């Protein structure tokens, strides 16, 4: 029996709808409009597409969008000065620096210059530490989106065995922390994991975030398991460029109970959760009640 397809595009639209409702309430009840500042350094084509999409969706939910486009040769001092100004701007509740940065800029230094309360990407070392110790933090958008989809599909995740394939600071590690927070038994697997297939076969939940096209075949999947595919890989097949995930979709979908497609699965949730994080940051800054269902 084929797996249930978890429609990330439809789920993201629901999240954006909830965010828009809360933004309208903030405007009407408190005269506050959440603001998201996005900083783009250079002219990387993919980054430009992402920034345009983020700006468009920010405005669509009723927030203010502030785009700062800097030349590729912008100095670190000038970039840090901009971040300092945004940190002090009361109309800006979220700050996102689009990655990757040009090679002469220190990404860690730049990210950690952002006020942790405005770090809507959840990459600041303070937010990493807060998440790791189970405290209130800004949570990275992609893992947050994965968690939302898992909760929506399963309800409670308590007691489930979860395997996260990938140990990046952006997805793998925070994903594991979030699953631990929901009382899963979590294994982080990676390129050095022995008998990776056997490890994955024990999982009720598989989150693939390793960046290798179609690495996970269907015979690695426990029957009925839920598969969350974070990977976005471009491959050449039959003379055409295709987007595929980190799991082999066709074979995994024959075994899994539920699966996210690529495209249309995790991807749309990332920007939706960025908007949710900006709303959360705004409510916290103004000491207002946080909206339900948009934070872990």
Swiss-Prot record:
HAMAP family: THF_DHG_CYH
Gene Ontology CC annotation, any one: cytosol
Record pathway: One-carbon metabolism; tetrahydrofolate interconversion
Job description of the protein: Catalyzes the oxidation of 5,10-methylenetetrahydrofolate to 5,10-methenyltetrahydrofolate and then the hydrolysis of 5,10-methenyltetrahydrofolate to 10-formyltetrahydrofolate.
Protein name: Bifunctional protein FolD 1/3
InterPro entries: Aminoacid_DH-like_N_sf, NAD(P)-bd_dom_sf, THF_DH/CycHdrlase, THF_DH/CycHdrlase_cat_dom, THF_DH/CycHdrlase_CS, THF_DH/CycHdrlase_NAD-bd_dom
SUPFAM superfamilies tied to this protein: Aminoacid dehydrogenase-like, N-terminal domain, NAD(P)-binding Rossmann-fold domains
GO molecular function, one term: methylenetetrahydrofolate dehydrogenase (NADP+) activity
Any Pfam family the entry gives: THF_DHG_CYH
E.C. designation(s): 1.5.1.5, 3.5.4.9
Family designation: Belongs to the tetrahydrofolate dehydrogenase/cyclohydrolase family.
Binding site for NADP(+): 166-168, 191, 232
UniProt keyword list: Amino-acid biosynthesis, Histidine biosynthesis, Hydrolase, Methionine biosynthesis, Multifunctional enzyme, NADP, One-carbon metabolism, Oxidoreductase, Purine biosynthesis
Keyword Oxidoreductase: yes
Alphabetical list of Gene3D superfamilies matching this protein: Leucine Dehydrogenase, chain A, domain 1, NAD(P)-binding Rossmann-like Domain
Catalytic activity: (6R)-5,10-methylene-5,6,7,8-tetrahydrofolate + NADP(+) = (6R)-5,10-methenyltetrahydrofolate + NADPH; (6R)-5,10-methenyltetrahydrofolate + H2O = (6R)-10-formyltetrahydrofolate + H(+)
A Gene Ontology biological process term: purine nucleotide biosynthetic process
Alphabetical list of PROSITE patterns matching this protein: THF_DHG_CYH_1, THF_DHG_CYH_2
Complexes and interactors: Homodimer.
